[in-house]
Amino acid sequence: MSIFKQFGLVAIALLLGVAFSSCGENPFSGSSQSNGSLPSSNAEKPVTEINMAMIPWVSSEKQNEDIQQLEEYLTKTLSLPVKITLTKSYQASIDLLVEEKVEIAYLGPFSYIKAKERNPNLEPLVAHIEKSTARPWYSSVIIANTTAGINNLQDLKGKRFGFVSKSSTSGFLVASAQFKEMKIEPERDFAAVEYAGGHDKNLEALIAGTVDASAVNKITYLQFFDQGKLPEDQYKLIWESNPIPNSPIVISSQLPSQLKSKLQIAFINAPEGLVNVGGVRASGYTSVRDEDYDLIRKIQKNLEK
């Protein structure tokens, strides 16, 4: 049975609950070269500034414009200085939050699971609502260059493949689970495996001919498609996953409870134009809980077998 059929109903049940409640390193472990030591005390401390890390979903120029607007909104709403930093990698955002060098981070679902494994006191606060579906989920897709002779997943063997990051959910984890189900081992069966570092960069590598197929989130694919960058006579969507819980904004245990509540309300009440900071088509935020990401844990566990 396909892993996505196996967990599909679980995913939908979990996600409906969300919607209506408001390369030596092992890529599946939460370990890092950094020790990620936790603070010696979990006591609440006065907060005079909020620092937030954000994973690099799309080109930094566009994302930085959106970040500045969100910074200004949160600073005004919370009456506290808010500084948002776009990190150079997924792992950098994970490390900053785990080690509590920032109070908040915008992470992918798998990045959150990795961070939570290293710092159990972390918790998801909100996730964005997908504009096209009005639901807090999205999907992973694989886009192929048909001129390379690729029309389905089996055709990927012997071709060059692009992932986003080993900490990316839609750009690595979910696609890897599908490959495992099909007994495809990327490092063995593909001519080359590349990691672009961002979803837009992964599609740019496909267009440039650096890779023959790429795993990305469907949102970024649709943006490129709408812009005419992926003409149908050359590029084809050859696979799409079942729904994945959307990327959470995760908070540190050092934040006072009252501030956590204020942050959650601020995000949920944010104007629509301020919720697209991850390069996604979002219409708002909804509250989420740790158990909403159990599907990702199950996929991770299956891959570790």
Go through the PLM ranges and name each one.
Residues 95-155:
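Acidic, polar ligand-binding/catalytic clefts
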Residues 2-92, 277-305:
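N-terminal hydrophobic or amphipathic helices and topogenic motifs
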Residues 47, 52-75, 87, 110, ...:
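Bilobed "Venus flytrap"/periplasmic-binding protein-like clamshell domains
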Residues 109-119, 178-181, 207-208, 212-232:
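A ligand-binding cleft/hinge motif common to bilobed small-molecule-binding domains
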Residues 51, 55-56, 131-141, 168-170, 196, 267-283, ...:
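Periplasmic-binding protein-like
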Residues 91-106, 118-119, 154-157, 198-219:
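Short helices/loops that flank or line small-molecule/ion binding pockets
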